[in-house]
Amino acid sequence: MDRRLIFLDIDGTLLPPGEMLIPESTLAALDCAKANGHRLFLCTGRNHRMTEPLLRHGCFAGAVCSAGGYVLCDGKTLVDIPMEPQQAEGVRAALERHGVECTLEARDATFGGVKMTQRWSFIHQKKGAPLNSEAERWRKAMEDGMSMLPLSDYKGEPLYKIVFIADHESDLAEAKRLYADQFVFCESKLDNLTDGFVNGELINRKFDKGTGIKAICDHLGYTLADTIGFGDSDNDLQMTDVAGISVCMANGSETLKKRCDRIAPSVYEDGIAKEFKALGLI
């Protein structure tokens, strides 16, 4: 296969949700793809700080972080678009008025409240319930003692994303009414949980994973047709919709599967390594 730019979501795609160690078989496939002349990038909702441990692997040339708000390639920052302060303050207030718990993601830190931890603790007790990959990431992160700073430590650092958990979808109504023109409300229901919890994230309409991919293509002189995007959840749609070849993991959402060109084996079944072979990347 001609040289490609390969973009990989993390949770539920590259790794089982919430994990930080790349399986040996996957790492070998990544290294082999790089040796064959392909360039690999993380493409994730995680902020820069949460991608750093993975970026230390020499196989990655950069990353689309914060769902496109912060983009790196070969050590150079290509995109850096935090929320405007009044925008972040306003949407956060509209959510919190209805009891929605938020975590605030800056480039190098994540801030969250005690109540957010308590709500995820409830999910910890529901381990038998199948969760979407974003929910599982947070559940696992809390279980492992995720390094989250208290909201009281937040001093106005530029924010790239707000993650939320609501008791009911209707709790988001005011924020959507006021800010739907500025943010994409990327929501997922917490399957099999009778309390009606909804988790998700706010993505600034100024960017998305797709615009991050385009920024890297422009920087390196590639076209979108030269890209391959791997994802598993609805927040990967903006990535897979622009990729030359789009791949959804077998453990992914039904919505994403319908929009992608290919279905790879599950993240739990060496899906990346197997699909790299199927595509002729290795």
Regions found by a protein language model. Name each.
Residues 60-67, 184-188, 246-251, 264-266:
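Short hydrophobic/aromatic-enriched beta-strand-loop microsegments
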